[in-house]
Amino acid sequence: MINDQLPRWVREARVGTRTGGPAMRPKTSDSPYFGWDSEDWPEVTRQLLSEQPLSGDTLVDAVLASWESIFESRLGSGFHIGTQIRPTPQVMGFLLHALIPLELANGDPSWRADLNSSEKDLVYQPDHKYSIEMKTSSHKDQIFGNRSFGVENPGKGKKAKDGYYVAVNFEKWSDAPGRLPRIRTIRYGWLDHTDWVAQKSQTGQQSSLPAVVSNTQLLAIHTGGQR
């Protein structure tokens, strides 16, 4: 049962419906989900989100403003992305990663972009425990990490993989014939480093999330279209 004392955006955040994916790794004792049944994980996530200084409404506004500004910007001799230029999904994701921290900092200077590889993508300067990792993907409902996310790798200078995450899924050009691609889903929540599962092959380059983790620990705060 959802606690009616939580902020509206937290109460309205939606559990996912994905199926399949890799088998889940065990939770460790330092996980906020440790000892809870997976049926209770959405409420654990809601509690974690209610403690975040960055509200879901502010985050959604920053993501959508960043996405829109990609298409409004002029490059070279007046060229526009979406008209003369169609970047790869990797480049579109890079632009989101660059713009979202700037949009947030413009409204609240407590936030800034990372300055080195040991910091999260979105740094909350008053208290780094609220800093946020961003994941973007042109997949319809999944996000991916480097293979290192799914293996024990506490190497020097590596950023912590436990903590708050925002996941942004956007359309590819081929998904949007005759129009500009849109943001599919913005999800917000918490992931532990053990939630990531590396590809079994040693040559595989990706890690992914089991469906139960994706559905219950990353809750949808925006789905479909623009503002």
Swiss-Prot record:
Q: Give, as one word, the top-level EC class.
A: hydrolase
Which top-level group of life is the source organism from? Bacteria
Tell me a Gene Ontology molecular-function term this record carries: type II site-specific deoxyribonuclease activity
Catalytic activities: Endonucleolytic cleavage of DNA to give specific double-stranded fragments with terminal 5'-phosphates
Keyword set includes Amino-acid biosynthesis: no
> What Pfam families would the database entry show?
RE_ScaI (PF09569)
**Alphabetical keyword list:** Endonuclease, Hydrolase, Nuclease, Restriction system
Q: Which InterPro entries match?
A: Restrct_endonuc_II_ScaI
**Protein's GO biological process:** DNA restriction-modification system
This entry's Enzyme Commission designation comes to 3.1.21.4
Segments carrying the region annotation (Disordered) are: 12-35
Protein name, as recorded: Type II restriction enzyme ScaI
What is the scientific name of the source organism? Answer: Streptomyces caespitosus
